[in-house]
A protein has these predicted regions:
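Short hydrophobic beta-strand element within catalytic cores of glycosyltransferases
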Residues: 286-289
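A conserved mid-protein helix/loop that constitutes part of the nucleotide-sugar donor-binding site
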Residues: 15-20, 189, 193-212, 312
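Aromatic "clamp/platform" in nucleotide-sugar-dependent glycosyltransferases that forms part
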Residues: 250, 269
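Short, structured helix-loop element that forms part of the nucleotide-activated donor/catalytic region
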Residues: 41-46, 151, 212, 221-244, ...
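Conserved acidic donor-binding segment of nucleotide-sugar-dependent glycosyltransferases
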Residues: 304-312, 320-326
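Donor nucleotide-sugar binding/catalytic pocket of nucleotide-sugar-dependent glycosyltransferases
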Residues: 52-53, 133, 137-179
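A short, well-ordered alpha-helix in the C-terminal region of glycosyltransferases
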Residues: 328-342
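Acidic anion/phosphate-binding donor-loop and adjacent secondary structure
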Residues: 61-65, 154-155, 169-188, 256
């Protein structure tokens, strides 16, 4: 029985999006989980994982804390002696991979998105590219969730193409996100956004577009679900107070919100593969999202693409959807589910991942 060490920076993403993969790995292996303790860790332990509490500072680069993390990973590898390490998120991807490389341990890395650091040509980006080049020198496989991110790593000479594998995101569990009948024709139209309230998710453009739409279509509702960055509190309070949006904060279960909505909106600036789009489409909801890698893959006769950072285009596409015949909205709903079943079925993604890991 092999030992597999999974390293990440939080329990939520690992449990919510990789649960089925972990279940598959547990069939023939001992699975160790290294990340900071969180509310879902106990669920991972109940599945059969062995948990090792490892503090990870998710934001920014601090030489002192990052060296501590590197050292804690070194001790962890000495203790567990894994046959394979699997990493998620940037710091485990770099620092755990560095340890695995020099320990001559097989390791696989997951790039679920490039984040804000890769969006501008600055010193931080150059440092990250440099560290990735060293860390991934001997990697077994690097999994990507979209072709654009894959090509960036290849073109930057971070990793060779034959060591990469593109997956269709983390996939969707079709039973966890079942098709739900489209809302009744007589109901007020509800648009839904789920995500962190931050600039990179396109929240500024959404708020501006929503304000214009509400003037023309007062009965249309905009529902916002997700945790808020501190600098947006005043803005969100203002839009709620003016009756433009309804804000529900973070929700453990977003499915009731998806079921209620007529269309899901995500005007993000960059994504690896937007799980909220896939989950909403799986439940049969049309989509409006950015014409970028990580978002556009979810669209197939089931919604509209918008120009990134373009609030006017977003307004136009929202208006276009409102004016659409009800029967066409229902057809989009069915197309959403069909597309997810054909391309993003979690079972297919897990199978491809296991193949990439050599299992």
């Amino acid at each position: 029985m092999k030992k597999i060490l999974i390293l990440a920076n939080n329990d939520v993403g690992l449990y919510k999006f990789r649960k089925e993969l972990i279940e598959e790995l547990l069939k023939d292996n001992e699975v160790y989980i290294s990340l900071p303790y969180g509310n879902l860790v106990d669920n991972l332990i109940k599945m059969g994982c062995k948990f090792i509490d490892t503090p990870v500072d998710r934001r920014g680069i601090n030489p002192i804390t990052d060296l501590k993390l590197l050292n804690s990973y070194r001790k962890l590898f000495n203790k567990v002696k894994p046959n394979l390490a699997v990493t998620y998120t940037i710091k485990p991807n770099i620092y755990a991979s560095l340890v695995a490389r020099f320990k001559k341990t097989d390791y696989a890395v997951n790039i679920t998105g490039l984040g804000t650091a890769f969006q501008s040509d600055n010193l931080l980006r150059k440092l990250i590219v440099f560290l990735y080049k060293i860390a991934l020198k001997k990697v077994k496989v690097v999994f990507f969730e979209n072709e654009e991110n894959q090509n960036i790593f290849i073109n930057e000479n971070i990793v060779e193409r034959n060591r990469t594998c593109k997956l269709n995101g983390a996939g969707v569990n079709l039973e966890d996100y079942p098709f739900m009948e489209y809302p009744d024709e007589n109901q007020n139209i509800h648009f839904l956004f789920i995500g962190r309230i931050m600039k990179e998710k396109g929240i500024d453009e959404l708020l501006e577009a929503a304000g214009k739409i509400k003037k023309e279509y007062p009965t249309v509702q905009f529902e916002i679900v997700g945790p808020m960055e501190d600098n947006y509190k005043g803005v969100i309070d203002k839009y709620v107070g003016n009756g433009i949006i309804n804000y529900y904060g973070f929700q453990n279960d977003v499915k009731p919100f998806i079921e209620k909505c007529h269309c899901f909106i995500l005007p993000s600036y960059h994504e690896g593969m937007a799980n909220t789009l896939l989950e909403s489409a799986s439940m049969g909801r049309p989509l409006i999202t950015s014409n970028i890698s990580g978002c556009k893959e979810a669209i197939n006769n089931n919604g509209y693409l918008v120009n990134v950072k373009d609030s006017n285009d977003l307004y136009e596409q929202i208006k276009r959807f409102i004016e659409l015949d009800y029967k066409d909205k229902v057809l989009m709903s069915k197309n959403s589910r069909k597309h997810i079943e054909e391309v993003f079925d979690k079972r297919k993604i897990v199978k491809e991942t296991m193949k990439g890991l050599g299992s």
